[in-house]
Amino acid sequence: MIHLRPYEASDDALRASILALLSDAFGEEGMPYYELAMDHLYDPDHTFLLSEEDASLVAVALVVDYVDPTDGRWAYLYSLTTREDHRGEGLMSRLYREEMEPRLVERGYRGACLVPATSSLVGFYKSWGFSLLRAADESTPITPGKRATDYLLAAYGEPCIDNPLPFQMIKPFGHTDDSYRLISPLD
């Protein structure tokens, strides 16, 4: 049976399992960044894990705070992955719908955003209620929160990346009439 598992920073075996899952999903060449993310971004409030009864890790999802100074916090969903032998079972969809989104709403996030790892995932995330976002421009004021800024400094030597809003898909948690461009020719 699959169940929600708490994140414990002191659990070295869990850290190794998360790193292995990320490496399998996104490639070994990213290992230095996965390790930096573990050091700066993962914590019990922002990390969602699914495990089997034997404690073997099945899925991982991370929430990174991004801030819009006029509109509040946004949850950047980062490194969402399910172990290959469990893909297609709906585990990540259930984790997002039943655990992540309700907690994000409860914690006062304005919405969630993400970058699909492949174009084939666009339809998958649309089924969660996400919409494609037109290319960001400098008028979009969302920037990394404190933990994300610390990570970016460690990873890249800069507190921000070239594009202040790297998200390609977005899901506001309430009605929006703001300037975020939720309509694209691909929707």
Where are these regions (language model features)?
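Short hydrophobic clusters on alpha-helical segments that form packing/core surfaces
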Residues: 77, 99-104, 121
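A conserved beta-strand-loop-helix scaffold within acyl/acetyltransferase catalytic domains
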Residues: 19, 23, 29-53, 59-81
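Conserved acetyl-CoA-binding loop-helix of GNAT-fold acetyltransferases
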Residues: 82, 88-102
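Conserved GNAT acetyl-CoA-binding A-motif
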Residues: 103-117
